Amino acid sequence: MCHTSCSPACQPTCCIHSPCQASCYVPVSCQSSVCMPVSCTRIVCVAPSCQPSVCVPVSCRPIIYVTPSCQSSGCCQPPCTTALCRPISCSTPSCC
């Protein structure tokens, strides 16, 4: 169930605790079954060249992406150019 602090647009089945705060989650446009936080951050979709059905939240701190074939030090900001991306932390973003 949604917390009282959730926005009116909250979908009750998608309301969970986010890393930042308890917040509403709503289905994102590129994959209706996936819910992402809407209170502490913006919603973005991974570029279609990366994977159109994958959506990721822009966290309270920057998120960058690395391809599975890259080492943890090889980072790149979206849009990614490969089929799969996953969020990681890294100090100096540089494309793989």
From Swiss-Prot:
The keyword Repeat applies. Sequence repeats lie at residues 10-14, 15-19, 24-28, 30-34, 35-39, 45-49, 50-54, 55-59, 60-64, 70-74, 75-79, 80-84, 85-89, 90-94. Residues 10-94 are annotated as: 14 X 5 AA approximate repeats. GO terms for cellular component: cytosol; keratin filament. Keywords: Keratin, Repeat. Disulfide bonds: none annotated. The keyword Ribosomal protein does not apply. One of its GO terms (molecular function) is identical protein binding. Restricted to a narrow region of the hair fiber cuticle, lying approximately 20 cell layers above the apex of the dermal papilla of the hair root; not detected in any other tissues. InterPro entries: KAP. Belongs to the KRTAP type 12 family. In the hair cortex, hair keratin intermediate filaments are embedded in an interfilamentous matrix, consisting of hair keratin-associated proteins (KRTAP), which are essential for the formation of a rigid and resistant hair shaft through their extensive disulfide bond cross-linking with abundant cysteine residues of hair keratins. The matrix proteins include the high-sulfur and high-glycine-tyrosine keratins. Interacts with hair keratins. This is Keratin-associated protein 12-3. It comes from Homo sapiens (Human).
